[in-house]
Amino acid sequence: LVVVVFLPFFLSDAVYDWYKSFNAAHGMVMSFLKFAILSSLGEVLGLRISAGVYNRKGFGIIPRMVVWGILGMGINAAMIIFSKGVPQFMEYMGMANAAATFTSEAMSLDKVLVALAISVTMNTIFAPVFMTFHKITDTHILMCGGSIKSLITPIPMTKIITGLNWNVQWNFVFKKTIPFFWYPAHTIT
């Protein structure tokens, strides 16, 4: 199914050109759609790996898609803010032409340095809040039995936050996935 969905983008220049122009003109809409589809697909595959099924009662694929879409718009906003702001800050701190270096076509050590600085800054400031909020929304969806009603039911923040496994959140999610996966991943992308 995934191959069928993506195949037209590889076979038709017209379809791919339309995608690129729509993405450029409607970045937030596309962020919502891409994250709703691809991130939810990742969660479904994760469930398949961990539980042997693609869906189960209470999992809430539709609410997860909506939440991922909203989170995707936040991620898009963060990428714009940090990719513009960090090079400006680097120039303020003394690196000449950091913004122009980052947006140039040419690959250079300075460009990699700017990309790494953007990634480290974004993932240090934004990612912990984002990941915690995502964990809260996932827990809320599960508490609502995976129902679409979870999208309009107030989130019991205190109950969920105090019930989070902070040992895992700190020692694995923050201390391992952010520096060892997200720093390099966002430096490359």
Predicted regions located by residue number:
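Alpha-helical transmembrane segments of multi-pass membrane proteins
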Residues: V2-D17
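Hydrophobic cores of alpha-helical transmembrane segments in multi-pass inner/ER membrane proteins
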Residues: K34-V44, P128-T132
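Hydrophobic/aromatic-rich structural module bridging two neighboring secondary-structure elements via a short loop
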Residues: S50-I81
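Transmembrane alpha-helix/helix-exit interface in multi-pass inner-membrane proteins
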Residues: G72-M93, S119-K149
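Membrane-interface interhelical connector segments
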Residues: V86-L113, C144-M157
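Hydrophobic alpha-helical membrane segments
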Residues: W166-H186
